[in-house]
Amino acid sequence: MAHSALSQVSVAVPLQTDSSFRRSTFKATSITFSDRSSWISMPPIDLKAAPSRNQHIVCMSVQQASKAKVSVSPLSLEDAKEPPLNIYKPKEPYTATIVSVERLVGPKAPGETCHIVIDHDGNLPYWEGQSYGVIPPGENPKKPGNPHNVRLYLIASTRYGDSFDGKTASLCVRRAVYYDPETGKEDPSKNGVCSNFLCDSKPGDKVKITGPSGKIMLLPEEIPNATHIMIGTGTGVAPFRGYLRRMFMESVPTKFNGLAWLFLGVANTDSLLYDDEFTKYLNDYPGNFRYDRALSREQKNNKGGKMYVQDKIEEYSDEIFKLLDEGAHIYFCGLKGMMPGIQDTLKRVAERRGESWEQKLSQLKKNKQWHVEVY
């Protein structure tokens, strides 16, 4: 039986002054699936890069899910009973290597978001839902003679990484750029040091990593048919990409047969992150995956205002509350500003149903169904 076997192909080409790619012909490396091994030859294609500040190398990934799940190794990564924590600390970080930097968003997206693959050679294992700390090069201007502070990033891959060999980790990073409110001009002195370092990095660059850290967003897998409701904004989708790859892409001992429901909030279509990957899961696993997008600059809510994730939550509130009553886990990840609106919506829905949101939230936390990681 034939399967769509393409999992990931990367091609690195220098950026021209007009920020466009050369015509490239490439061939995939061998990818091993749980039932066979395949080679795929790709015809010549044109890849047009959106204008990017990265003037070094961008590695574009052709990445799709496949119903023939990908074999992963080493399976010994499944053996640990507890998640790895703080293997490397700020005073003695691990020096990893940048593998690739890929611009994820289109030209109409406000801002730039990059997918960054880091090679740790298997020395910095992690679980889905954990974070790495990154220490950018240079001196901390507030503490002369000291390195920059650690910046935490939730990992956007499974423990096996995008190469499925347990040697890489992926980060989803939005470049932080500061614009003067009076002049409207960029002030580079106030730009985010770490995000710009990562988005400007090129293959072969070294990066200091700490961690892994975090237990709040770990994916509970004791019940294979559990329901997981994921609500993310922007780069907050990172841990959910890891969850979904583990559920639907990788051949792992934990055979997921429940429901995963992703709500993703971004500005517009060009801002969607990993959308092709999620759409493929939707097509391949319609009984196990639901995917709802809230595009604030393109969609309207039922009151005629901008569409945010809390509006989607309210739209499906009866289903969501029923699933929570049945034991579903619910996860929130993104900017801190997302939570007040979401909490207000959940409280309003609960009151409409004749319930106390405070009591319900307390019970969800007690049952370890409530997971929040905001920054």
Curated annotation (Swiss-Prot):
A Gene Ontology BP annotation from the UniProt entry: photosynthesis
Residues that hold NADP(+) according to the record: R174, T235, V266, A267, S296, R297, K306, G334, L335, E373
GO molecular function, one term: ferredoxin-NADP+ reductase activity
Pathway(s) served: Energy metabolism; photosynthesis
Protein's UniProt keywords contain NADP: yes
Catalyzed reactions: 2 reduced [2Fe-2S]-[ferredoxin] + NADP(+) + H(+) = 2 oxidized [2Fe-2S]-[ferredoxin] + NADPH
Transit peptide: 1-60
Enzyme class: oxidoreductase
GO cellular component: chloroplast
Cofactor(s) listed: FAD
PANTHER family: PTHR43314
UniProt function note: May play a key role in regulating the relative amounts of cyclic and non-cyclic electron flow to meet the demands of the plant for ATP and reducing power. Is involved in nitrate assimilation.
Family: Belongs to the ferredoxin--NADP reductase type 1 family.
Subcellular localization, as worded in the UniProt entry: Plastid, Chloroplast
The name this protein goes by in its record: Ferredoxin--NADP reductase, root-type isozyme, chloroplastic
PROSITE patterns assigned to the protein according to its UniProt record, in alphabetical order: FAD_FR
Alphabetic keyword roster: Chloroplast, Electron transport, FAD, Flavoprotein, NADP, Oxidoreductase, Photosynthesis, Plastid, Transit peptide, Transport
UniProt: FAD binding residues: R151, L152, Y153, L154, C172, V173, R174, Y178, V193, C194, S195, T235
Enzyme Commission number: 1.18.1.2
Boundaries of every FAD-binding FR-type domain copy: 91-219
Pfam families: NAD_binding_1
Keyword Transit peptide set for record: yes
Lineage start: Eukaryota, Viridiplantae, Streptophyta, Embryophyta, Tracheophyta
Highest taxon of the lineage: Eukaryota
Disulfide bridge partners, by residue number: none
